[in-house]
């Protein structure tokens, strides 16, 4: 039995690290600290040229909830076109109504657009903020998505194992349930064996110091507690050890 290990990244250095670690698919984002936003066209284009595995672009125009305005929805459609033009293989999005249900009408428009461009579709962790997950599961299957990225509605996938197990059973292989949030080499084998998921998602996040020799300590480019001279990156060994842990149970 083979497992898929999807790695979410938000910079080109992390792409190299994820591939070296054995990632089988990439979720391309910007701003992972905000949960992942749409990557730039330049990032998508270069990643497509460099990658040896499929890349799915996050389509999320802002941080926060998944209730989008008409303008934001228009941006999402344009960004799906950009992902195809950049040479990517798929897109990742999720839309909810104000009542916490899947926004079926708008999701259908995006799925049909993606499919018309030969792009695969993942419904992301907006699913974890819906009020009726099993009804939402059926809707997402009917809409034609390939997979759902979910923590089992919990703070992390290990904490959501019970719901993940139920989702796998209910899906009956009509789409993939991909476990994400808090996945690590330490817990991934148990997570897969317990729930039956065949796909996992992680960032393998780490940091490295800036290569700047001059450190401007008084100015900040963002929040006061943000260190501009610490660079977040994917840790190659974390990805490699996750892959090896899954191979040990295959």
Swiss-Prot record:
Single Gene Ontology MF annotation: copper ion binding
Cellular component GO terms held in the UniProt record: cytoplasm
Keyword Transport: no
Listed Gene3D superfamilies: Copper homeostasis (CutC) domain
Residue ranges that the Swiss-Prot or TrEMBL entry lists as coiled coil: none
Keywords linked to the UniProt accession: Cytoplasm
Pfam families the UniProt entry points to: CutC
Keyword Cytoplasm applies: yes
Entry's localization field: Cytoplasm
SUPFAM superfamilies in UniProt: CutC-like
Alphabetized InterPro entries for the sequence: CutC-like (IPR005627), CutC-like_dom_sf (IPR036822)
Principal location: cytoplasm
UniProt family annotation: Belongs to the CutC family.
HAMAP family: CutC (MF_00795)
Protein name: PF03932 family protein CutC
Organism: Vibrio vulnificus (strain CMCP6)
Gene encoding the protein: cutC
């Amino acid at each position: 039995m083979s497992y898929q290990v999807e790695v979410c990244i938000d910079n080109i250095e992390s792409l190299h690290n994820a591939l070296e670690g054995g990632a089988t698919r990439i979720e391309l984002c910007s701003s992972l600290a905000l949960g992942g936003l749409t990557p730039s066209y330049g990032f998508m284009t270069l990643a497509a040229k460099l990658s040896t595995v499929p890349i799915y672009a996050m389509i999320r125009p802002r941080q926060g909830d998944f209730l989008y305005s008409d303008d934001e929805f228009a941006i999402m459609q344009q960004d799906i076109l950009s992902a195809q033009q950049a040479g990517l293989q798929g897109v990742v999005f999720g839309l909810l109504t104000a009542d916490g249900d899947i926004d079926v009408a708008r999701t259908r428009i995006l799925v049909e657009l993606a499919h018309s461009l030969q792009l695969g579709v993942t419904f992301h962790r907006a699913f974890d903020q819906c009020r009726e997950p099993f009804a939402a599961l059926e809707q997402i299957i009917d809409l034609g998505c390939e997979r759902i990225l979910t923590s089992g509605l919990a703070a992390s996938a290990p904490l959501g194992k019970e719901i993940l197990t139920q989702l796998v059973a209910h899906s009956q292989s009509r789409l993939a349930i991909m476990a994400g949030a808090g996945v690590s080499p330490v817990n991934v084998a148990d997570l897969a064996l317990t729930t039956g998921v065949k796909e996992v998602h992680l960032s393998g996040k780490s940091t490295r110091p800036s290569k700047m020799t001059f450190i401007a300590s008084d100015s900040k480019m963002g929040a006061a507690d943000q260190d501009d001279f610490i660079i977040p990156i994917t840790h190659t060994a974390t990805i490699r050890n996750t892959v090896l842990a899954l191979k040990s149970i295959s």
